[in-house]
C-alpha cells in the first residue's frame, strides 16, 4: 500500500498549548439525545415501518432519554406521519422533547413546523454543511454564502416559532464540522447565535458533529475546547456532540470531548448509523457507570434493549459487542477462569460494596445478565473454570487436586472434539467418571462396624460389595469406617491403597439431604480420586473409595 498512501494527507492539529481537557475527568452524565429514529433509521437497508419505530420510541422513553430525534418529517410522508403520531398518540412524557431534523430550506422548514404542531417544547434541529470540501465541490459557495444559508434559516425558524406561540427549542449543526476550518465554523455558529439570541430559559444547542471521523480523538477534543472558549454567549449555549465512528474511535472521541467542555451527546443504541455507525450511547453510558458515575439512562435490562434494537433495526448485535454481546462476560482462558473464580469467591466472603473481580469490569447482574455464562469450557480452559462451572451450576466444590485431575480428562475431550463443552456435559462426565462408573468392576452395597476387641481404639468393618455383579463380603480393621474399609478392600484386591485426602459437603439443605464425598487414594504407582453421593455421609465416603478403586483397577488393566 505505500504507493496508495500518497493520496492521503495528515489531518491538521489544533494549536492549544494550554488545553485543559487532559487533566479532567467525567463526573456527571451529559444530556443524551437519541437519534436512532433518524440517523440510525436512514442507515438501515430496510428502514423501519411504523411498528418498529413505535417500539424503539417507547424503549427510548423507558430508558430515560429526555430528547429523542424522531425523524426528518419534511423529507418523507412516512417521517411526517410518524411525527404526528408521536405528538397525538405517542404518550410522550412532559419532560421529553421531540426533536426533528431539517435542512436550511424555507419549504422544508414550513413543513417541519406543520409536523410539530401541538408538541411540548420540541427541538427544531436545522443544519447546513460547512466543510471546505463541500463548499468547494458540492455547493460552489464561499464562506459568506454558506453563512447566509444558516442565518436565513435561523431567522425563519425563530419567526415561525414566535408566530406559533413559542415553546420551541432550537439546535444548529454546522454539518461536517470536523472538515470545517475552526475559524469558519466559529463565524457561522456565532452568526446563528446572534439571530436566535438564546437565554438562560431557552438555550440554543450548538451541535458540533464529527460527521465523518477524520482524526484521533484528542483532535476532536481540542476542537471542542477551542469552540467552547470562543463561542459567543457560551453561558446560554448547550454544546452538543454528534460523533461518527469511521476510524473506530467514536466513543473515545465523545468521552474526550466531554472533558473538553461539551454538555450533550447525540448517538444511537449500540452505535447503529451511517457507514461504521454513530457513537454507541449504551457503551458510553456503561463506561461512566463503571467509573461510579450515574449515566442517567437505564441499561439495567440490557437483554430487552438488545431485543428491541434487533427487532426494530433488523440487525444482529455482535457476540463481542461491549457490555451486551453474548460472549463479553465469558472466559475460556484457563488463567482468566481461575482468576475470576477466585475473585468471585473473595467478593462473596468480603461482602465489600466495591466491585472487584478480575477480567470483569462490571457486575453482569447490574445489566440484567447472570453469572451462568461467565466461564465456558473449551481446549483453552483450566481447572479453575471447570471448578467454577461445577460449583455454580451443580453445587460441587471439588478439591484442588481433583480439579487438576478432572481438567486433564476434560482437556482430552475438548482436544479431540475441538469445540466448547456445555455445562451439563461437563457435569455428566464428572458423575460418570467419578460416581456412577457404568463400566466399573466394583460396587458398594452395605457395611457394618463393631469394636475390635483385640486392638484397642480400632473398629472392624464388615462390608458387602459386588465384583462384576457377584456379592462379596470383605472385612478390615482401622480407626474408623473409612480406614477400615480401605484396609478391607486393599486385602481383597491385593493392592495396597490408602486415603491421602478426604472432604465432603452437602448438596442440598435439610436432614435428608444428599452429600458428596471426595476421596484421594494412593496406590503403588500414583494417586487417584473417587467420589460418592448418598444421603448417608459414611456410605458416600465408602462409595468414593470404591470409585477410586475402580479407577486404580482400570489403570492396572490399561484402560485409563
Curated annotation (Swiss-Prot):
Top-level taxon of the source organism: Bacteria
Transmembrane segments: none
Top-rank EC class of the record's enzyme: transferase
One term under GO cellular component: cytoplasm
UniProt record similarity statement: Belongs to the alpha-IPM synthase/homocitrate synthase family. LeuA type 2 subfamily.
Record note on quaternary structure: Homodimer.
Name of this protein: 2-isopropylmalate synthase
Phylogenetic placement of the source organism: Bacteria, Pseudomonadati, Pseudomonadota, Alphaproteobacteria, Hyphomicrobiales
